[in-house]
Curated annotation (Swiss-Prot):
This is Putative B3 domain-containing protein At5g35780. InterPro entries: At2g31720-like (IPR005508), B3_DNA-bd (IPR003340), DNA-bd_pseudobarrel_sf (IPR015300). Pfam families: At2g31720-like. The keyword GTP-binding does not apply. Residues 206-307 bind DNA. Its main location: nucleus. It comes from Arabidopsis thaliana (Mouse-ear cress). Residues 135-149 have a biased composition (Basic residues). Residues 112-149 are annotated as: Disordered. It comes from the Eukaryota. Disulfide bonds: none annotated. Keywords: DNA-binding, Nucleus, Transcription, Transcription regulation. It is found in: Nucleus. GO terms for molecular function: DNA binding.
Amino acid sequence: MTMYDLTDSGKDMCSSLCLLAEVAVMVAEEEQFRRLLKTVSKEEDSDKSFFYRFPRKIRSSLVKRRYTQQNPNGASTSSAVLDLNLITTDYDLKTQQNPSFDEPLVGLGKTEKKNLTNPNYQSSSSSSCLTENKSRKRRAVQQRKSGKLKKARVVSLPRMSIETPEWVFQVMRYMNADAETPRLIFERTLFNSDVKSGLSRLLIPFQQLIRNDFLTPAECRAIQKDEDNEDDKNIGVGTILVNQRSKMWGLRFKIWAMEKDSGHGTLNYILNWGWNDVVKGNGLKAGDNISLWTFRCRGVLCFPLET
């Protein structure tokens, strides 16, 4: 009788241990599943687009366009100072090649203006893409107007050495920018149209570019768009504009064909989607002289603005 009781007790103990083991396995599997969901969630967050991280200001003329879905409430967030933590963090560090930023900047204090015998003076993938863009835009303007497209006048600039301002290097170090030489691409005196709130854009004519090799092939493809397409499928390239006080704004950079009453048209780049906030934040007015430089921060195109 005693042996029978001990046997039952042993069976009960074994059953309890098996039950505990099963519970432990279930708990471990649940924890692993939660970790997997967390990893997937992080990957999905890292894949979100530039315009999700830097929401643009909704304009009334753009309400019906598809990209309003990125900001359905129409809230204006472009006026806020951008947080560097919002910039894409999953940029490939192997290609970034920026272990020590101070060393690559030594000796990079100068850039040269080129004689613009042709706006596309550099034979690169980006300039060839720009040439294709110009041909398409010319055809689009010609279809809307019977007149001929006005040819860009060649502007010959004196060959001179321009020293990069020290504040540009300081901003690059502050933003932990990619190790590359900052490039001066544009200088101009602002007109009334550049600071008019109803237009909210900075016009950058092709023929006034100092250099045009600052776009990647992917960015060239992103700004290609048929001007007759009302859907505006191309939303341009997301960029960051930064001033001398390291204050930043998220803007859109794209191509724009400007028509004239004569039937002629010109091709330009524009910076918009928040340009009014840049004007207010820097106190810009007609007659001010500005300079635009370029560099990249984790692959994102950045424009230092000197006033």
